[in-house]
């Protein structure tokens, strides 16, 4: 079984989603089940309904799970196993206060040594009112594991001291809950961010202490950098999956991009299901990869092109395939649904005919064309059915030509002074002329 284990303490970012996608693909390739484990052990930081938001996003991306568990439902089992380790002298109570430990950290810093917990401190403050935590005994030998991306990773015994597995309130720490739940659900392979590399030997230590000898596979993904080259932070809008969706990027385009980041793919544009045939986690680059919004925009445009007109219309909140066709036409100059919606909204909004951004004024010409168009629409003039016939009839009736004809006509039809060729767009606009040709008051 493979798993994706999000925490309901914040928004899902693209690094989380990338890990979820890779775990899901590998589960499909190996015909294994896919587990979602909500890691809600940090009770103070859990955000109400954030778990539902995460699950809705996973569902939207088509990452359908076979099992769903909440880590908190296993708290009693975690406590039982902590007591088991204590009974075997593989874990112990520690009564050290936060102040005592902080003083030891400062000592180590002054001596320019790495801080390492000393088990002999455990009962120094036992007579005080300090509630004890439970610590697992540190490693007695080096711990190594194979990483599908980074190769063999080795941690010396002195790097893995006696760390906390149960807090003073009896809540398990992240590493303890994670290690036990991976055992309980028979997880075989874990794909996660490289910020978890230092957690892996600790989780292996817990497995060994509990007599769990299954060797898990690991792949730690390199971080994603912002366009500036620095690590992406929560302040980077593009790091948020919700923001990308709100901007009008399709789930299938986002997945396409995240799978191809730092990877060799047989084609530029593909769907999630295509990746089942060729994806190999070992091909993911070891070094950090820079987020490229231009690349994502390109892929989004390509995935929008793959939609039929009815599908496109539904994404634009319309049931009329002509609106979908209009949207597809705008892919010549737009890449996201928001950009296309904006252009179509301008078409159907009352038109402002005052001076435009270039300082040009076609107010008189717009009024002349508006009056003629209004008459043609009301009389169901047959010349409206074909662009060339329509253009010639309107030009003859208005006595306007050149720039003084085409720019005001474009303003009346699209609300803009530049854009697609009117001959391309008119076949789709003609069905809506009564709604389109309106002036703002």
UniProtKB/Swiss-Prot annotation:
Keywords: Aminoacyl-tRNA synthetase, ATP-binding, Cytoplasm, Ligase, Nucleotide-binding, Protein biosynthesis. ATP binds at residue 234. It catalyses: tRNA(Glu) + L-glutamate + ATP = L-glutamyl-tRNA(Glu) + AMP + diphosphate. A motif ('KMSKS' region) lies at residues 231-235. PANTHER family: GLUTAMATE--TRNA LIGASE, GLUTAMATE--TRNA LIGASE, MITOCHONDRIAL-RELATED. Monomer. Belongs to the class-I aminoacyl-tRNA synthetase family. Glutamate--tRNA ligase type 1 subfamily. It holds the Pfam family Anticodon_2. Its main location: cytoplasm. The gene is gltX2. Signal peptide: none annotated. GO terms for biological process: glutamyl-tRNA aminoacylation. One of its GO terms (molecular function) is glutamate-tRNA ligase activity. Catalyzes the attachment of glutamate to tRNA(Glu) in a two-step reaction: glutamate is first activated by ATP to form Glu-AMP and then transferred to the acceptor end of tRNA(Glu). InterPro entries: aa-tRNA-synth_I_cd-bd, aa-tRNA-synth_I_codon-bd_sub2, aa-tRNA-synth_I_CS, aa_tRNA-synth_I_cd-bd_sf, Glu-tRNA-ligase_bac/mito, Glu/Gln-tRNA-synth, Glu/Gln-tRNA-synth_Ib_cat-dom, GluQ/Sye. A motif ('HIGH' region) lies at residues 6-16. GO terms for cellular component: cytosol. Transmembrane segments: none annotated. It is found in: Cytoplasm. It is an enzyme of class 6 (ligase). Its EC number is 6.1.1.17. This is Glutamate--tRNA ligase 2.
């Amino acid at each position: 079984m493979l798993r994706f284990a999000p925490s309901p303490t914040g928004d899902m970012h693209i690094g989380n989603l990338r890990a979820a996608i890779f775990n899901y693909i590998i589960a499909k390739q190996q015909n294994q089940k896919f587990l979602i484990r909500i890691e809600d052990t940090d009770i103070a930081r859990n955000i109400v309904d954030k778990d539902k938001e995460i699950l809705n996003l996973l569902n939207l991306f088509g990452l359908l799970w076979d099992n769903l568990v909440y880590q908190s439902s296993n708290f009693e089992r975690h406590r039982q196993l902590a007591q088991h380790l204590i009974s075997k002298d593989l874990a112990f109570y520690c009564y050290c206060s936060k102040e005592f430990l902080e003083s030891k950290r400062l000592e180590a810093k002054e001596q320019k040594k790495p801080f390492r917990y000393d088990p002999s401190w455990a009962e120094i403050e036992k007579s005080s009112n300090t509630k004890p935590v439970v610590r697992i005994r540190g490693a007695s030998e080096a711990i190594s594991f194979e990483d599908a991306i980074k190769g063999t990773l080795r941690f010396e015994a002195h790097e893995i001291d006696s760390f906390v597995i149960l807090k003073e309130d009896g809540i398990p720490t992240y590493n303890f809950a994670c290690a036990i739940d991976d055992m309980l659900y028979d997880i075989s392979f874990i794909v996660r961010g490289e910020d978890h590399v230092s957690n892996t030997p600790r989780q292996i230590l817990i497995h060994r202490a509990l007599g769990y000898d299954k060797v898990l596979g690991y792949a730690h993904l390199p971080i994603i950098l912002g366009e500036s080259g620095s690590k992406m932070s929560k302040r980077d809008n593009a790091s948020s999956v919700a923001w990308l969706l709100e901007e009008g990027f399709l789930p299938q385009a986002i997945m396409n991009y995240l799978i191809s980041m730092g990877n060799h793919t047989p084609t530029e544009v593909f769907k999630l299901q295509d990746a089942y045939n060729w994806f190999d986690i070992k091909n993911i680059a070891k070094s950090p990869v820079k987020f490229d919004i231009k690349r994502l925009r390109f892929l989004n445009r390509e995935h929008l092109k793959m939609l039929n007109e009815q599908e496109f219309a539904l994404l634009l909140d319309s049931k009329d395939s002509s609106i979908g066709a209009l949207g597809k036409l705008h892919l010549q100059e737009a890449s996201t649904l928001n950009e296309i919606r904006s252009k179509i909204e301008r078409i159907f909004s009352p038109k402002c005919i005052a001076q435009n951004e270039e300082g040009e004024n076609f107010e008189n010409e717009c009024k002349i064309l508006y009056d003629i168009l209004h008459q043609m629409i009301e009389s169901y003039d047959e010349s409206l059915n074909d662009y060339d016939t329509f253009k010639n009839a309107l030009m003859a009736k208005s006595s306007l030509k050149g720039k003084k004809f085409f720019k005001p006509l474009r303003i009346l039809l699209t609300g803009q002074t530049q854009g697609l060729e009117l001959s391309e767009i008119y076949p789709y606009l003609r069905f809506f002329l009564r709604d389109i040709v309106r002036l703002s008051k």
